[in-house]
Amino acid sequence: MKYTLTKANPDADVYPAQTSQTVNDPMEDEVNKNVFMGRLEDLVHSTANWGRKHSLWPFNFGTSCCYVEYATTLTAVHDLSRFGAEVIRASPRQADVMIVAGTCFVKMAPVIQRLYEQMLEPKWVISMGACANSGGMYDIYSVVQGVDKIIPVDVYVPGCPPRPEALIQGLMLLQESITKERRPLGIHVNDQGIYQPQMTPERDRKQADRIAVKNLRSPDSI
């Protein structure tokens, strides 16, 4: 839609003392600009997520027998390098995915939490095995009933112990979720200057809700 703007010109010596000009709808220009920037932002996010999902560096960390199955995925039979996750890191500061493979004991819980906090964003967690998921058969005082009680978990891999194919499937599920993430790409520049957004992942926001669902009430409290 075209708009005609009429501007008064008091210094004009001829009639009419005004100037008419036909311009585009300013709302249409803003929509076109926002659509272009939105598509450009989607393209940048897709490119960043594609690189992140194909360069997952696992943290070399195992707590029990499930780690044996995890190590099997690195052999030539399963070849975890096909998914870009063969670069095992010995330091949490160089890794972006922690695979908790095995039982999480109470004495090990603060160590796991500290190592998770030392990892840089973006970071993900895979809980491997029944013991890491819910404590497994160890319903005793010395075992944490699920590693998600201390750190947020992205993917749960069931089994006791799970086969290497199950871990690979869990890794593929994590890659699929990474492609749908909308994380800040870094420093943003806008009309108000330069800023770096701090966004809390939805996984961390709903951590307490997930724990509340897993905490079953006793018959006395029903």
Swiss-Prot record:
Its EC number(s): 7.1.1.-
PROSITE patterns noted in UniProt: COMPLEX1_20K
Q: Which UniProt keywords apply?
A: 4Fe-4S, Cell inner membrane, Cell membrane, Iron, Iron-sulfur, Membrane, Metal-binding, NAD, Quinone, Translocase, Transport, Ubiquinone
Keyword Lipid biosynthesis included in the entry's annotation: no
List all Basic and acidic residues biased stretches: 201-212
| Gene Ontology biological process terms from the UniProt entry | aerobic respiration; electron transport coupled proton transport
> Which parts of the sequence are annotated with region: Disordered?
200-222
Reactions catalysed according to its record: a quinone + NADH + 5 H(+)(in) = a quinol + NAD(+) + 4 H(+)(out)
Q: Which InterPro entries match?
A: NADH_UbQ_OxRdtase-like_20kDa, NADH_UQ_OxRdtase_20Kd_su
Keyword Transmembrane attached? no
Q: Which Gene3D superfamilies does the entry mention?
A: 3.40.50.12280
Free-text remark on how the cofactor is bound: Binds 1 [4Fe-4S] cluster.
Which family, according to the similarity comment? Belongs to the complex I 20 kDa subunit family.
Q: What function does this protein fulfil?
A: NDH-1 shuttles electrons from NADH, via FMN and iron-sulfur (Fe-S) centers, to quinones in the respiratory chain. The immediate electron acceptor for the enzyme in this species is believed to be ubiquinone. Couples the redox reaction to proton translocation (for every two electrons transferred, four hydrogen ions are translocated across the cytoplasmic membrane), and thus conserves the redox energy in a proton gradient.
> What protein name does the entry list?
NADH-quinone oxidoreductase subunit B
- Identify the species of origin: Psychrobacter arcticus (strain DSM 17307 / VKM B-2377 / 273-4)
